[in-house]
Every structure is written in structure tokens, then in C-alpha cells.
Amino acid sequence: MTTTENAQPRLKTRYREEIKTALNDEFKYANVMQIPGVVKVVVNMGVGDAARDAKLINGAVTDLALITGQKPEIRKARKSIAQFKLREGMPIGARVTLRGDRMWEFLDRLVSIALPRIRDFRGLSPKQFDGKGNYTFGLTEQSMFHEIDVDSIDRPRGMDITVVTSATTDDEGRALLRQLGFPFKEN
């Protein structure tokens, strides 16, 4: 009989072994439970043109499923807006909430593979924190992820990525994400 060990995500192991102690040394927490960590990652893809053509949402759902490894939730319009020819209940986007090992694997792929593949990339803005240590940024197209076949893209779709942390201040959240390998611009 053989015993198989579950492979831990690389970034999760690094967080537990190195990053937690580095953050504790930097901020001098009274309790180890105060050390900030990543709670969840939300990937949202808005498809405004889906109001006119409902088939466009399928491409966004397929792309998000390939990128995240999880089936996206189709988001529907909450209100009708006549100027946008939008009715309540029409599909207008797709969203995935990643937690646990899938979240760590996605963050690892994002930081080590996807972000360096962006043309003319000079780093993420360090000013996009929400005041509670959570970070949101946008990507203009999905082709930087290696799971997406560049030839099969019907149109470029952008996405918003929100990294929710248990940090209480922006400085703690920034320190956590910098330790995880997020490339922030130096001002």
C-alpha cells in the first residue's frame, strides 16, 4: 500500500513557511491570527455587448472556465436601462470566486506567467487598494493566460481581478501582495 501526499500549491507553501514570518517581523503582531492572508480571488468579466447578442456571453464563460478551472456564474442585469437597451434579467457578465488551493494556483499562474506576458508591462499601480487591504486591478485582454489558445479568440475581453485579503490596512495588504510576488510600480 502506498501513501500519496496531496501536493500543496507552491505559493501556499511559500506563504506558510516564509511570508507569514516576514510579515510578523515587519508589523509585530501580538497574535499569529492577525497576520494577513488571502481570503479569496474574484475574477469578473463584464460583457456589455451581450445585451444585444446573448451568444457573446458563451465566449466569456468559456474563457473564464479555462483561465480559472472553475465554472463561472452568469451575472444578470438587476435593473432595466433604456439607453443601453438593457432589460432586467439579461445576461451581462460572468464571475468566478476562487478560494482554497484553486485560488493559490491561480495567483501563482497570474504572477509568474500571465503578468510578465503583457506587452509594455511596467508593474501594477500600488494605489488601487480599497482602504481595507483588498486590491482590484483590470486586464485588457485574456490572451496573456497560457490556457487560452490565441487562434481561437473571437474577440479580446478584459477582466477585473479582486484579491480579498484579511489585512486591516492598505499597507498590510500591499506588503502581503508584494511578498507574494505582485509587481507593483515604484513611484
UniProtKB/Swiss-Prot annotation:
Highest taxon, organism lineage: Bacteria
Keywords attached to this entry: Ribonucleoprotein, Ribosomal protein, RNA-binding, rRNA-binding, tRNA-binding
Quaternary organization: Part of the 50S ribosomal subunit; part of the 5S rRNA/L5/L18/L25 subcomplex. Contacts the 5S rRNA and the P site tRNA. Forms a bridge to the 30S subunit in the 70S ribosome.
NCBIfam families per record: PRK00010.1
Its job: This is one of the proteins that bind and probably mediate the attachment of the 5S RNA into the large ribosomal subunit, where it forms part of the central protuberance. In the 70S ribosome it contacts protein S13 of the 30S subunit (bridge B1b), connecting the 2 subunits; this bridge is implicated in subunit movement. Contacts the P site tRNA; the 5S rRNA and some of its associated proteins might help stabilize positioning of ribosome-bound tRNAs.
Family to which the UniProt record says this protein belongs: Belongs to the universal ribosomal protein uL5 family.
Name listed for the protein in its UniProt record: Large ribosomal subunit protein uL5
GN (gene name): rplE
